Amino acid sequence: MIPRLPRYFLKYFIIFTFFCVTFCFLKLCLGENGVEKKNHKTIEAYQYTHTFIHSAYYYPKSKSLGENAVVLVTTMNKRTMWKILDYKINMIGTNQSTHHTTRASLSTEHRIIERCDYMLIIAQTNSIDNMDKLEIEAEGVLVEIPYKKPIYIAPKPVIFCVSPQFAAEQWQTFLVQLHVSKRYGAHLQLYIVSMVESYFNLISEYEKMGLVSIEPWLTIKFSSTDGPYLEPNRNVELRNQAGAHTDCLLKYKESASFIGSLDMDDILIPNNANSYYEEFEREYAGSQFISALHYDKYDYKTIKVSELRSQSLSAIVKNAERLSTKDTGKSFVRPERFNSTWSHWSRAAQKKPIYLDGYEKPILRELKTISNNGMFHLKNMYLTEFNDLGIGQIPLNPTDNVTQLIEREHLAEIDADMKRMLSMPSISKLADSLPKEEFYMPIIFKCYNESFYHLRDTNQMRPDILCVNAYSCDLPQQVGNRCVHSDATYHSGPPMWPISFHFATNSFFSRDIGCYQ
């Protein structure tokens, strides 16, 4: 005879089983103290490496990064592991009452197949309200990272980010770039590695007037390590120019309407527009499908004179001769559409899916190459006596060979403004100290040509074979004409696996280092 079960046994058994299953499920999904336990993908590291943090930004609010965004601009060794972009960095944000740990995703403007071992890596996450402390954590080891907030009021709606200058001496190019940009409504953000002191003093006078912002671009240094490491400056693309351009983009992305990345000798003159803002708005035309505006660079040779009082944009323009070559162009962007950039354009500019409110499917933005304008690239400038200058004509726009490169009225305005400013006592007193002849430029050009220009110009440069870098260029120091060089207080965090982090504070310009990269 089968024994009879107690009354309601089945009901109690079902309830008991339900609670047991629920308890086991919660134990699996929750860690201690009720904190959610996430099953993160394990990334196997190959080696212990070092990363230099150029800058860290905290955005309480952002148009494109979200609230409490944190972004790090770094030079990182991609060979730390097989797929460096799969790695996540634990970041801890702390405010007055609590702390919050998130895992920052990594991205880059470079292709992983490229030869350079070090490359620009962006680390991005969203942290905590009113953050007042930022730390990186790995296996219980912490390092505090200094950070800054972006600029929320831009000097002008258009910002031009100029590539880091090293052993810079051609001050005439700066005057052209500054006065053309000033006339058409752009503010220059300039990064300097090293520069002839008198040239630096000239730029500093323009900085005092609010026409240019100067920032040291630091040589990468690991101040303390517990073993040998691969030298980063020699194994990264051109002093990590992309890092400087990305830093500039992040600095102004909440305040500027347009941001461009260019070299000092890349001169952009609007076509059939009174300002850069007018031209960029016209070319974007309110479209959500345009990622960036891309301008080709047309090479020119022209003259330069050594006397400060004789500087004239008209003389440079009217003695310019178009060369048969073109150089890789530059891009100008709406900053809310990008979080990083390469030196010429962002890798995210072409066919990257973007999800917008009200759209069920992503849109694919594309780079727009400007067909009716290009950059006036001052590729070669030859010293000429002022009295020997010829009187030529304004060159034609290289894209149509019909319109003039610059309107006569605008050229006259810029000349008058340049003459007025160069006659100011604070600037005119620098005339005798500025370089009167070339010293570093021929050396650098020769080294660049031997290192990679000859390969680029013959279409033989393969990024998977050659790391574009000229750190080994031998730069002799010029007697009696010293340079300023970027410097800072360098810091190294504790050893961490697999990456130890290094950074700098209190950057400044030193007169005791010399003209080096």
From Swiss-Prot:
Topological category with respect to the lipid bilayer: Single-pass membrane protein
Family that this chain belongs to: Belongs to the glycosyltransferase 92 family.
Superkingdom of source: Eukaryota
InterPro entries for this protein: Glyco_transf_92, GTase_92
One GO cellular component term: membrane
Transmembrane segment boundaries: 9-31
EC number: 2.4.1.-
Main location (coarse class): membrane
Keywords: Glycosyltransferase, Membrane, Transferase, Transmembrane, Transmembrane helix
GT92 domain span: 156-454
Protein localization: Membrane
Protein name as it appears in the record: Glycosyltransferase family 92 protein F55C10.4
GO MF annotation list: glycosyltransferase activity
Pfam families the record matches: Glyco_transf_92
